[in-house]
Amino acid sequence: MEKKIIFLCFLVALLTFPEFISSEVIRDSVIHDEEKFANRSYCIKTCATEFTGGDESRIKDVRPRHYKCVCWYYSD
């Protein structure tokens, strides 16, 4: 039983490892003047346009903040 638990932990770590080494995640923000807190879809589109050339699949996460969107995106 103990070997199965260790094997499962190793397997989970192995499956998540490529995400960490595949590309660097960059944190940056975009200022917007339209709303105090923009909605999430607006932030995704704005961050994709600003940092990835419109590629929304490279956006990892966004957080609407006070008159800005905080973006996490993959460098390559």
Swiss-Prot record:
One of its GO terms (cellular component) is extracellular region. Contains 2 disulfide bonds. The keyword Cytoplasm does not apply. GO terms for molecular function: toxin activity. Expressed by the venom gland. It is found in: Secreted. Belongs to the scoloptoxin-15 family. This is U-scoloptoxin(15)-Ssd3b.
